Amino acid sequence: MKEEELLNLAQEAGFEAAVLPADRVPTDGKFRAFCEENRCGQYGANFSCPPTCGSPEQMRDKTLAKQTALVLKTTWPIANYQDTVAILHGKQTHNRKMLRLNESLGGLCAGGSCCCLCIPCRMKTGESCPYPDLRFSCMSAYCIDVAELCKRCGMTFAWDETLLSVYSMILL
């Protein structure tokens, strides 16, 4: 699919979007530390999260196995960064829109947060994942430097106390 077609599909789905060659997606193993801090509570408790999802090197290899990165962004109003209900809503809505878009693309998703196909993840109950081909890891699990990614594809990257920006990508 041509770049213009990808951008049009993404914009029709409600995303700000950009396209970048997959080998230009910046990764750095130091970003795995964000997962290891376990602020989201999913480290070792979600099939899509570290350490289960793979090492930083394995995640980089998944990125390099693809040709194109369709980078996606949505923004959501929040009261502040303690507004966990609005933040969760923004991230989950973004990820669901990403999955719907990917139904027609068949790519590999890196979400704005961890996989949300099952809440809670079946890993927490000792069951196997019912969606191994659909589950997705987050940008941090892929060790993506999102600020640099935005710079490379011309997107604005900024923190705002009252506006949540959620980033993801579909690798094709």
Residue ranges of model-derived segments:
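Auxiliary alpha/beta "docking" domains used to position bulky ligands
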Residues: 1-172
